[in-house]
Each structure stands twice: as C-alpha cells, then as structure tokens.
UniProtKB/Swiss-Prot annotation:
Protein name in UniProt: Non-structural protein NP-1
InterPro entries: Bocavirus_NP1
Transcription regulation listed as a keyword: yes
Biological function: Required for the expression of the capsid proteins. Performs the splicing and internal polyadenylation of the viral capsid-encoding mRNA precursor, which allows its maturation and expression. Transactivates the viral promoter.
Gene Ontology cellular component list: host cell nucleus
UniProt-listed Pfam families: NP1-WLL
Biased composition annotated in UniProt, kind: Basic and acidic residues: 74-87
Major localisation: host cell
Keyword DNA repair: no
Basic residues composition-biased segments: 24-41
Recorded superkingdom: Viruses
Compositionally biased region (Polar residues): 60-73
Amino acid sequence: MSSGNMKDKHRSYKRKGSPERGERKRHWQTTHHRSRSRSPIRHSGERGSGSYHQEHPISHLSSCTASKTSDQVMKTRESTSGKKDNRTNPYTVFSQHRASNPEAPGWCGFYWHSTRIARDGTNSIFNEMKQQFQQLQIDNKIGWDNTRELLFNQKKTLDQKYRNMFWHFRNNSDCERCNYWDDVYRRHLANVSSQTEADEITDEEMLSAAESMEADASN
C-alpha cells in the first residue's frame, strides 16, 4: 500500500473516532448526569438524617433553652419552698403574743414603728401611687415632671412619719409600751435561728401580715 493511501486511511480513522473512545465518553456523561440529579422525593413528614438540624436549628435551640429555664425555675421554687413559712416579722410576732396575752399594752416601740412605716411605704406604692399614676399616664407612660411629683409626695409623707417616731423616742425614753414590745421582739429574736432571720421579708409579705393583723384587731 502506498504512503498516500496510508495517510488517507489514518485521517479517516481519526475523524470517525474509535468505538472504545466513544463508549467511554457516553459512560462518563451518563455517570456525571446521575451524580448531579436531585435526591428522590420523599412523602410528607419524611426527612433525611441531617435535614432536621439544618432546617430547624432555632426551634431546636429554643426548646432546649425553654426546658432549661423551666427546670431552673422549678429548682428555685423547690429550694425556697418552706422558708417563707418560717420567716417572721414584728407584725406576726406581736399579734401572736397579744393573742396569748390579752392584757398586753398598746402597740409601740422601735420594732413596731419601723415596721409600721415600712408597711405604709409599701401600701403607698401599691395603692395611692398606683392610682395617681393611672390618672396621669398617657399610653401607660408619664413624664419626668409627674414622676418627680409622685416621688416627692411619698417622701414628704414618710419624712413626717419618721420625724414623729424620732420625736417620740427622744421625749419618751422611758415609754413602758416601747420597752414592753421591744423586749417581746428581742426575746423572739433570741429564740430563732440566725438562718431564718437572715431571710429578708418582702414588701408583699409585710403588707399582707399587717392587713391580717389589723383585721384581727378590729374583730
């Protein structure tokens, strides 16, 4: 065969391509197309193993946080339950003492007056100042001028009560009623544990005890 015929045959072979090469090309295209196809559609409610954590990380975190918060609240309530029942204040101590000692003199003394004034301040916040705020508020808000006026009114009232108490202690240093009730409460403090007395009485508890005491006295 001449060299010219050989060259023509070789060119024709390159243009057509070998059967093996064409088969490899089709196989690669088929494989590449399958790898890029979407995953099969699942029925409603079905998810992949990792889809939930990818699509709902916020809801998952919120549920965990809410659970921890609820557990902490329950632990706090459990740890504090029972303590409030053991705590006392002058109102409760004096009312119990008077119940067993009807001949006791009228209320007086440092513990009585200091607790009474603290009760008056709490009562002013929950009742008088609340009503005044509701009269002045616009969209449940008041300005600084009105706020200052409310605070000064309360200060003026409490200042007068403290001045009256100081005047009494200065001019009646030998008040029998003061000595009696202060001694009652000192003896009470000597009989209770330091752990119980370290627990502070809340304003709500003080107000509730005072109201109960006044109701008992009126009856």
